[in-house]
């Protein structure tokens, strides 16, 4: 459409231009046309000749000579015509320029209008497309609304049917409700009658329970006071026990320092003995070389044969001593191997004991809960007894293991001290060569071989491991006792807060008492205290028997005193296993004449000055038999 309108406008503009040119085209006179037709190409020359100045014409006239007037007039007339034509043409040219300018302006206006029309057409087309899209979307929405309407109508019909069914059910439920209300009213009436009948009985029971709870509360107050007093006593005994332990540890540390100094001196003496042995070996090698050399032709003298016999005896004696030292070293290596095996067995036992202690710890945590305390008292009492028995068994096993380890270590110490003290048994010097120079007698000593070094290092490592294990057992038992105390405190708290509950005994070393339903008499608290004292006396007697057995084992020739690091692990909160070193040291002094060595004597003197901790029996009073006995 727009192109057609443009073509039409262009055709109309062309027509207007033609009409304008026809109107404004100049009308040429007839004389000029004639001159053009007749002269052809001459008019330009004529115009140019006509434009010449009059001087030229005059000169030409004078040159040509005299002419007639007619010819002059004929010449002037075309010149005038040509001037008029030129003027008319200049005017036409200016008019044409003006028309061109106006046409250009019209053309620009027409182009501007065409562009505006194009933009308007584009906008209309875009709007048309948008409207078409909107019409399509509206049609789709219309279809969707129709489908929704259809579904809504169907759902309305369904809900109407359902509402009718619900109304019918409501009527039935209301009828059922009325029936149930009538039944409920009858039941409530019967219950009220029964409650009135039972209220009289319950009042009597509550009064009797209140009286019983008051009695139990008074008994519990008395028991609380006793428990506080016993707790203060236990704290005082614990402080004394800790101070005593600190003093004993300081003593053992001093002993260990002395032992380390003595070991250093023994090492120095050992080095000196090694040097002597080297000298003796050199002298022996020289003697062997001399014996291997051929005898001189001169007859030997009598004193040389005596010296040779003496040297042979010396060689035999030195060889025997060396063989004995080799046997001793082999025996020490075997003892070290056995000791390592026993240490491994002890580590396995300790690991098993740690697992048992962890299981006991878990069971204690479970038993510490208040619900389990009051819901299952019989099971808890059984578990407590089992735990106490297990703890006692563990302590007995630990005591036996410590005694065995102490005896073994004492044997090893005595053997090593005897081996180190052997260099002091010299019997004077004798002549080694024919010149009569005196030399020290060969003294046997422990050779500085790798087996002896390994034995010493393994021995020290064993002591350190035993100290670590004893500390670990201490920590485990402290945790066990701490949880046991927490459990006892929780029981007392629950018994005080709930006077109608059932009470149980919470004793670490005492007997087992169950709480009954009936109240006890006034002398029950005294009986509980008597039970605690009896348990303590039994415990003390058992401890004395254990110490006596330890002393008897120390009097035997084989076992000895425990190492200082291990004695710290023997005091297991009431089971203080301490063995004196006096009897073993005295027995060794009687049997071994090798203790004349100056480095071995201070060890025995130190053990004699400090006879151990067996005489001071300090046992904490931890038998908490403070709860009342209830007889069935």
From Swiss-Prot:
Gene Ontology biological process terms, A to Z: Golgi organization
Signal peptide (UniProt feature, chain positions): none
Region of interest called Disordered, as start-end residue ranges on this chain: 1-76, 352-377, 423-452, 496-524
Basic and acidic residues bias: start-end ranges: 352-362, 427-440
CC annotations in GO: cis-Golgi network; Golgi cis cisterna; Golgi cisterna membrane
Coiled coil: 86-154, 220-421
Comp. bias intervals (Gly residues): 508-520
Keyword terms: Coiled coil
Keyword Coiled coil in record: yes
Homology family: Belongs to the GOLGA8 family.
Entry protein name: Golgin subfamily A member 8J
Species for this entry: Homo sapiens
Taxonomy of the source species: Eukaryota, Metazoa, Chordata, Craniata, Vertebrata
């Amino acid at each position: 459409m727009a192109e057609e309108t443009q073509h039409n406008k262009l055709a109309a503009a062309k027509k207007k231009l033609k009409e304008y040119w026809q109107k404004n085209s100049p009308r040429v006179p007839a004389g000029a046309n004639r001159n053009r037709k007749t002269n052809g190409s001459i008019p330009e020359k004529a115009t140019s000749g006509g434009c010449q100045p009059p001087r030229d014409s005059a000169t030409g006239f004078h040159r040509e000579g005299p002419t007639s007037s007619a010819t002059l007039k004929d010449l002037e007339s075309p010149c005038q015509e040509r001037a008029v034509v030129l003027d008319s043409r200049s005017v036409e040219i200016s008019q044409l320029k003006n028309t061109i300018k106006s046409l250009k302006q019209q053309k620009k206006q027409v182009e501007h209008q065409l562009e505006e029309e194009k933009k308007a057409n584009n906008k209309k087309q875009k709007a048309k497309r948008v409207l078409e899209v909107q019409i399509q979307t509206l049609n789709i929405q219309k279809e969707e609304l129709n489908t929704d309407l259809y579904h809504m109508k169907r759902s309305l019909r369904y809900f109407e049917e359902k509402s009718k069914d619900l109304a019918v059910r409501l009527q039935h439920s209301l009828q059922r409700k009325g029936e149930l209300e009538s039944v409920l009213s009858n039941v409530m009436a019967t219950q009220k009658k029964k409650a009135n009948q039972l209220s009289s009985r319950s009042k009597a029971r509550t009064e009797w329970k209140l009286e019983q709870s008051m009695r139990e509360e008074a008994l519990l107050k008395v028991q609380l006071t006793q428990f506080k007093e016993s707790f203060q006593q236990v704290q005082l005994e614990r402080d004394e026990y800790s101070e005593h332990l600190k003093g004993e540890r300081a003593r053992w540390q001093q002993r260990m320092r002395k032992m380390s100094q003595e070991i250093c001196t023994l090492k120095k003496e050992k080095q000196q003995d090694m040097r002597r042995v080297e000298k003796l070996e050199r002298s022996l090698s020289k003697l062997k070389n001399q014996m291997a050399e051929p005898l001189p032709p001169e007859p030997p003298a009598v004193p040389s044969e005596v010296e040779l016999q003496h040297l042979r005896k010396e060689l035999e004696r030195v060889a025997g001593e060396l063989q004995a030292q080799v046997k001793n070293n082999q025996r020490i290596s075997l003892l070290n191997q056995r000791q390592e095996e026993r240490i491994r067995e002890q580590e396995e036992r300790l690991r098993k004991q740690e697992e048992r202690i962890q299981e006991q710890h878990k069971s204690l945590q479970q038993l510490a809960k208040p619900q389990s305390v009051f819901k299952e008292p019989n099971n808890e009492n059984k578990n407590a007894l089992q735990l106490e028995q297990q703890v006692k068994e563990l302590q007995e096993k630990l005591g036996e293991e410590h005694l065995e380890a102490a005896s073994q270590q004492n044997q090893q110490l005595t053997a090593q001290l005897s081996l180190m003290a052997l260099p002091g048994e010299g019997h004077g010097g004798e002549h080694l060569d024919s010149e009569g120079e005196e030399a020290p007698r060969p003294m046997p000593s422990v050779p500085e071989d790798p087996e002896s070094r390994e034995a010493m290092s393994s021995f020290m490592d064993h002591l350190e491991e035993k100290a670590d294990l004893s500390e670990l057992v201490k920590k485990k038992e402290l945790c066990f006792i701490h949880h046991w105390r927490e459990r006892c405190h929780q029981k007392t708290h629950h018994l005080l807060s709930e006077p109608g509950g059932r009470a149980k005994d919470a004793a670490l070393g005492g007997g087992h008492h169950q709480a009954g339903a009936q109240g006890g008499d006034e002398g029950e608290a005294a009986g509980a205290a008597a039970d605690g004292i009896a348990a303590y006396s039994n415990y003390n007697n058992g401890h004395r028997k254990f110490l006596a057995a330890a002393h008897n084992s120390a009097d035997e020739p084989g076992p000895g005193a425990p190492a200082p690091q291990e004695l710290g692990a023997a005091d297991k909160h009431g089971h203080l296993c301490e063995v004196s070193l006096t009897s073993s040291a005295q027995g060794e002094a009687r049997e071994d004449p090798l203790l004349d060595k100056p480095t071995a004597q201070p060890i025995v003197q130190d053990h004699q000055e400090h006879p151990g901790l067996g005489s001071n029996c300090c046992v904490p009073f931890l038998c908490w038999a403070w709860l009342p006995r209830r007889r069935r």
